[in-house]
Regions:
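Polar, enzyme-active/binding microenvironments
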Residues: 7, 11-14, 20-21, 25-29, ...
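Glycine-enriched, solvent-exposed interface loops adjoining structured elements
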Residues: 1-105, 187-191, 223-366
Length: 366
């Protein structure tokens, strides 16, 4: 359970032999109580700034590209994806281009929304990470595709009733049509399920995926994934100065001749990221990882973004600030030494990764 602002403050007050606060008196604190509230926040800010790459602040996000758009905003609240937050540090080593996922709610995480009933009564099943249950039922969804482009389709099926039933996987230019693809997926290993991996070529700008179980037995679809049949490409990071000296003239020229699959990513001078070459498709997705800015505590019941293991480090640092306020240098030095030791232990156990050597030499045949 995450530690509340009130708990942190009272832990410091308790060790200082001062009167503690309650939820009802927290907003009306006085004297040393108010000072400790400020010192707890100050301690948290210092820890965030010192460690930065705290797992509790980690977020992974994605940005869809647009044809001809070179620069994109870095994360802010609920942008580019719902759940995003203002960033503190971007991990540019994680930028990669992945094919854009076309299916909406293809993982069935909490519901079967975005799917239309074709026949029967498709239902949600909470098994696994969430599944679409079909019992004498069918469901379909329309997708935006590009004519003559090849797409990769993956479907995982679980035979919940161990009946040996078959699932029809249909792709067509209308709901429940099979003019593009007609596959039958069966499960023989009832414990593990079965996965369909196949490809199809779109024949229109709108394509329909249909999942159909004609039998009165339970078949659960674990996930449906459709994207362009292209691989994942890691982007190399370069500095803005490097981009400006090498590619500025090409990228700023009013011509689409230089558009293509991005290979490089760089930070602009106005807190955005740029891609080179400029994307030539809307069907790329840029995925990357970052650490968000923490949320300051205000009310007594507010909880910190950090893991509870950070509680003692925050308390010790807040004690140090209080001892300095009280002009008690001996106690302050003891608290400082304890804080440094706690922070070092926490960093090694919680954040530092195992070190290893990697050979980056390139072998050239003589």
């Amino acid at each position: 359970m995450a530690t509340t602002y009130l708990t942190l403050v009272n832990n410091v007050l308790n060790e200082l032999n001062e009167s503690e606060l309650t939820a009802s008196t927290f907003a009306n604190s006085r004297g040393v109580q108010t000072a400790v509230k400020k010192f707890v926040l100050k301690a948290m800010h210092e820890i965030y700034s010192t460690l930065q790459e705290v797992p509790d602040l980690y977020i992974s996000t994605k940005q869809d590209t647009q044809v001809g758009q070179r620069v994109y905003d870095l994360p802010t609240a609920n942008s580019p994806q719902t759940g995003d937050a203002e960033y503190r540090k971007i991990d540019y080593d994680t930028f990669r281009i992945v094919p854009k996922e076309l299916v909406t709610n293809g993982e069935f995480t909490s519901a079967i929304t975005s799917w239309t009933t074709g026949s029967g009564s498709p239902a949600y099943n909470s098994g696994g990470n969430g599944r679409l249950r079909l019992n004498a039922a069918a469901a379909y969804q329309s997708l935006s595709t590009v004519k003559n482009v090849q797409y990769r389709l993956q479907v995982r099926l679980i035979d919940s009733s161990s009946s040996g039933g078959n699932l029809k996987v249909l792709v067509g230019t209308s709901a429940e049509a099979s003019d593009v693809l007609n596959e039958t997926l069966a499960v023989t290993d009832f414990g593990a399920g079965n996965i369909l991996n196949t490809t199809f070529t779109a024949t229109a700008a709108t394509t329909f995926i249909t999942l159909d179980n004609d039998n009165s037995t339970n078949l659960d679809v674990d996930y449906v994934r459709i994207s362009e049949d292209t691989g994942i490409k890691k982007l190399k990071y370069i500095t803005y100065d490097n981009w400006a000296s090498r590619f500025l003239e090409t990228d700023l020229e009013n011509s689409s001749e230089h558009y293509g699959l991005p290979e490089l990513v760089y930070t602009t001078q106005d807190k955005k990221f740029g891609l080179h070459p400029i994307p030539d498709k809307d069907t790329y997705t840029v995925e990357y990882e970052y650490w968000k800015v923490h949320t300051d505590l205000s009310a007594a019941t507010d909880t910190m973004d950090l893991n509870d293991r950070f509680k003692d480090v925050i308390i010790t640092r807040a004690k140090y600030y209080t001892y300095v306020l009280r002009s008690d240098p001996q106690a302050a030095q003891m608290a400082l030494a304890e804080y440094k030791l706690q922070l070092q232990i926490l960093r090694s156990e919680y954040i530092n990764t195992k070190a290893y050597m990697r050979d980056t030499r390139v072998h050239v045949n003589a």
